[in-house]
């Protein structure tokens, strides 16, 4: 191989290794990598550890423990219970999400039920509701 091709390949390999290291770095909360869960018909417990959690699938029963920067639920008929979340985003139909403390709630879909106990900082959460028959209430 000539020197130019070798340098290009080594440069590309170095860039890929650097990108891989970045993807393993701490998430926005600084504690570890964000969590992505992509499955159907599962029961699971996820440790948030001050990062973002994304749940994609249908008919899951998920418990999210600890503080989260963001909780994203995409799919239908999921049941999610979470401790403390800065931002909850739900896209789909017939999901049930219960959160202890939350600052922002965004819902896109129909027939979702989002319950929260406390707003962050003692304030009611900001709510965006796009869809029909969504129930977003304080428990």
Which positions does each model-derived feature cover?
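Extended beta-solenoid/beta-helix repeat architectures
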Residues: 22-139
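Bacterial N-terminal signal peptides that target proteins for export
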Residues: 2-12
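Bacterial N-terminal signal peptides
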Residues: 11-20
């Amino acid at each position: 191989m000539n020197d130019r091709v070798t340098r290009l390949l080594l440069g590309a390999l170095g860039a890929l290794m650097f990108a891989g290291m970045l993807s393993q770095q701490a998430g926005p909360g600084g504690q570890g990598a964000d969590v992505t869960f992509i499955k159907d018909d599962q029961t699971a417990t996820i440790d948030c550890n001050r990062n973002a959690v994304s749940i994609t699938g249908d008919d899951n029963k998920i418990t999210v423990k600890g503080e989260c920067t963001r909780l994203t639920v995409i799919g239908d008929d999921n049941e999610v219970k979470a401790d403390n979340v800065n931002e909850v985003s739900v896209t789909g139909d017939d999901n049930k999400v219960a959160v202890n403390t939350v600052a922002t709630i965004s819902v896109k879909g129909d027939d979702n039920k989002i319950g929260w106990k406390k707003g962050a900082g003692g304030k009611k959460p900001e709510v965006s509701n796009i869809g029909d028959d969504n129930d977003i209430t304080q428990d």
